[in-house]
Design a protein with these regions (language model features):
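C-terminal scaffold of the Radical SAM
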Residues: 1-215
Length: 215
């Protein structure tokens, strides 16, 4: 699993070097190889190098298609652009695609959430991750003096997402994650099953021999 952060911001030369390092390890038993992408970084050249290096799952940060929400998060997503890129990704052989949806943004309404969840569903991802906005201390967001949405509305949004995705045959297998049958993330399940994992890179976490560490 390559991410979080935004590894897709690396240029092709940097990605080539990264995959050279990854190949130093025995990957013969790897069933799921995920790479996180910012939708704006996705190009044919990027997908080609991922396919060449056996990446078989993408996690794409859509977050929203609402201009006000995206402006608040300093992001950009256009539905038609995203749709074309996902078609291109599938045509190149990667069919296991997760899309992220952020909700509970200041001033967001349930109506806005419903509309954008429907757009996400039109893209037919195999997996959907939904995250409510969290205000972390000392971050730019926490210093903006914005007012979080009402907790009751946030709960209503969460319950709507849960029920809507269940009707669309997505299994709610983990707090924030929903998957079509057979597409539950092995990476996520590894955490939930309290299994071991190595974390490489700045700020990465790992869990070995009952000890959790942070770089």
């Amino acid at each position: 699993y390559i991410g979080g952060g935004t590894p897709s911001s690396l240029n092709i030369s940097e990605l080539t070097k990264l995959f050279e390092i990854v190949k130093l390890f025995n990957l013969s038993k790897i069933k799921e190889f995920t790479f996180e992408c910012n939708v704006n970084d996705i190009t044919e050249e990027l997908i080609d190098i991922l396919v060449k290096n056996k990446v078989n799952r993408l996690s794409i940060g859509i977050e929203s298609f609402n201009k006000d929400k995206l402006k608040f998060m300093e992001r950009y997503s256009d539905f038609l652009d995203v749709s074309k890129k996902i078609d291109m990704i599938r045509n190149k052989g990667i069919n296991n695609i997760n899309l992220d949806l952020m909700y509970a943004i200041p001033n967001e309404t349930l109506k806005v959430l419903k509309h954008h969840l429907n757009l996400i569903l039109k893209l037919k991802p195999t997996h959907i991750s939904t995250y409510s906005l969290i205000y972390e201390d000392y971050t730019k967001l926490s210093l903006m003096n914005t007012t979080p949405i009402d907790e009751e509305l946030e709960l209503e949004m969460y319950n709507y997402i849960r029920k809507k995705l269940s009707k669309k045959k997505y299994n709610h297998y983990e707090i924030s994650n929903f998957a079509l049958d057979g597409y539950e993330s092995l990476h996520n399940l590894n955490y939930w099953n309290n299994n071991e994992y190595y974390g490489f890179g700045l700020g990465a976490h790992g869990y070995i021999d009952g000890i959790r560490y942070e770089n």
